């Protein structure tokens, strides 16, 4: 998408890359569509998708998002072919879910983290755990199979294990935080944390698990209390890792942050989330803010190239 002054797409294809708030999202104690509309992720209902890599190279969020996108298309028109596609993605996640040991319930990545952060295999991602749980809960509700529900419950296990013990639970400003990339020191990636905690909400609401509901509320409160740290005064931050310069979000991720916080205002409203949405939208409409964000992103990538492991970031 060509850049438009005052629009986040000025320095990325933000509108096409960043999906909107889910059209079938249920605000009350019901599970409908996903919080973010991943429909564009699934172009056809054929499984496996052509991008699926070997076991040792897979990023499990890609599988979960493809399945959630297929489920969204099923909700659009009731086409059972799309539900079967979502189910195929869920079956794939069941096959790859770790059984036993310190990574029990997790979807382990068997390759090093390919960019920005240094993570050696095997490593887990709270984002993958949450999105995987969200897909499996929906498959259970659609077909009644308990094995999907049980796998969704198990997916939450690593969220209760500290990063230092091979889990994905960290602490930020005295509250819990779920790490997309469980680095030490913490990276605190905003979009990944939001995708992660939605898995807790889906297990809580869809499977009537009160403990998951309590964890979701604690995490929502904690994130609301620390959301100000992602506001640079002109744009949002991608993470809080102590890089040499702040990792300003790309236009696409800035828009994703905005849409994710809009979804949070539907299911777990907090004044801090609403204030962040207003600020982020104001920045996106500002030509000077957009230009400044572009300049800082360029500087960041000069110092921390995307295609090279970040120096100084210790593995788990």
Residue ranges and their predicted role:
Residues 1-316:
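Glycan-recognition and catalytic cores of secretory/periplasmic carbohydrate-active enzymes
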């Amino acid at each position: 998408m060509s850049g438009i002054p005052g629009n986040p797409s000025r320095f990325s294809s933000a509108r096409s890359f960043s999906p909107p708030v889910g059209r079938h999202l249920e605000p009350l104690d019901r599970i409908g569509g996903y919080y973010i509309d991943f429909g564009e992720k699934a172009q056809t209902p054929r499984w496996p998708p052509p991008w699926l890599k070997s076991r040792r190279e897979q990023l499990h969020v890609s599988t979960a998002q493809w399945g959630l996108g297929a489920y969204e298309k099923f909700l659009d028109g009731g086409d059972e072919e799309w539900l079967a596609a979502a189910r195929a993605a869920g079956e794939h996640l069941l096959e790859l879910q770790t059984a036993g040991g310190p990574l029990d319930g997790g979807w382990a990545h068997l390759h090093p983290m390919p960019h920005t952060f240094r993570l050696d295999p095997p490593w887990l991602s709270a984002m993958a755990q949450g999105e995987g749980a969200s897909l499996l809960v929906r498959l259970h509700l659609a077909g009644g199979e308990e094995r999907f529900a049980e796998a969704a419950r198990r997916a939450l296990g690593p969220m209760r294990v500290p990063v230092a013990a091979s889990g994905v639970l960290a602490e930020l400003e005295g509250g819990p935080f779920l790490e997309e990339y469980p680095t030490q020191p913490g990276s605190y990636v905003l979009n990944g944390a939001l995708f992660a905690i939605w898995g807790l909400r889906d297990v809580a609401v869809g499977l009537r698990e009160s403990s998951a509901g309590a964890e979701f509320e604690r995490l929502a409160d904690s994130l609301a209390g620390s959301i100000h740290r992602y506001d640079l005064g002109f744009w949002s931050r991608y993470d809080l890792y102590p890089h040499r310069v702040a990792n300003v979000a790309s236009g696409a991720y800035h828009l994703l942050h905005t849409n994710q916080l809009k979804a949070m205002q539907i299911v777990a409203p907090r004044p801090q989330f609403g204030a962040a949405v207003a600020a982020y939208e104001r920045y996106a409409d500002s030509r000077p803010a957009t230009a400044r964000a572009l300049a800082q992103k360029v500087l960041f990538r000069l110092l921390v190239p995307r295609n090279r492991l970040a120096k100084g970031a210790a593995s788990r």
